[in-house]
Amino acid sequence: ELRAELIRAGHVFRTDHSDTEVLLRIFQRLGFETCLSKLRGMFAFAVWDTHEETLYCARDRLGVKPFVYAQTDRGFLFSSEIQGLFALRTDLSRTPDYQAIDHYLTFQYIPAPMSGFKSIRKLPPAHALVVKKGRIERIFRYWNLDLTKRSGVSFGEASETLREMVIEATRLRLVSDVPLGAFLSGGVDSSITVAAIARLGASPLETFSIGFEDERFNELPFAREVAQHLGTEHHEMIVKPDAVSVMPRMIDHLGEPLADNSVMPTFYVSEFARSRLTVALTGDGGDESFAGYRRFYQIRRLEWLAERGLIPAWRGLRKLTVALED
């Protein structure tokens, strides 16, 4: 979309399909902050302006792509992984950030801008930063989700609008110069993603599922049923999780603690899919967006009780939440 817009404006591209060149062109044409408002999807980038001797960095709205950095006495370092920073500067301090660890024990992850190390920061989602002469000049939020609007549409209208938005979001992510596939667990999230891809006519579509010998955790039959219904080229593999052998690799990539029990299955299915392709769509984020976890229902029950004055401490808890967000 941006490429077509730039071509109509008279820009000539040196490549046929480079997202990087499109980003640079839109950056040159609109400037940093206006450029960010045009970008859709996941990204993390850094652009060096040779004329201004300024580095411009940004991370996508939801923080899908990682961006970590360190400000040192010798300049500014950035990477997509924490291990990348330690590779750049072997003497970079590895002192733990105990406040970040405290947050991890509370929230089961370390929220940005903190990391597990005092010397390293994470650029938060929907944020950008500007570096001049090796020093951070400013960090700012360029987008925020407006939760105050109420549309007033019916449930049916909202459902149809949501369906159209899912299809459109999927269509945008099918633009790729390499073959792509999809992870399929048989659950609602990944099944909707694969159904959207199939509806858009992306064929042949390869889907990937992993299963376990323990039937309590094996979802292969559900994934197989969805794959047959949608006519995908389906691949399955039974795995025997060995946390001891893969944990060092996972820790290297994560760079910090993360109490998410889906990390291990995701690691295995990613490794499985990588044997055939390099790009795959997933259903990640569905439960978070549409309150699919039991804890969201429990919070709604707490709100119901609080509205009736049955939880005296509720007002204090709400203030604590606001304080943490600030």
Q: Predicted segment positions?
A:
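Conserved catalytic micro-motifs used in adenylation/nucleotidyl-transfer and phosphoryl/amide-
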Residues: 1-5, 32-87, 115-141, 192-194
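ATP-dependent adenylate-handling active sites, centered on carboxylate activation for C-N bond formation
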Residues: 5-8, 44, 50-76, 133, ...
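Short, polar/flexible loop-turn hinges at active-site or ligand-entry regions and domain interfaces
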Residues: 6-15, 30-35, 88-95, 114, ...
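Adenosyl-5′-phosphate
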Residues: 8, 12, 86-93, 118-125, ...
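Short, conserved phosphate-binding/catalytic loop or strand-edge motifs used
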Residues: 19-24
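Active-site-adjacent loop/helix segments that line or gate small-molecule/cofactor pockets in enzymes
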Residues: 25, 97-113
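Active-site loops of AMP-binding adenylate-forming
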Residues: 27-29, 106-110, 250-255, 295
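Short, conserved clusters of charged catalytic residues that mark active-site
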Residues: 30-31, 38-40, 112-115, 161, ...
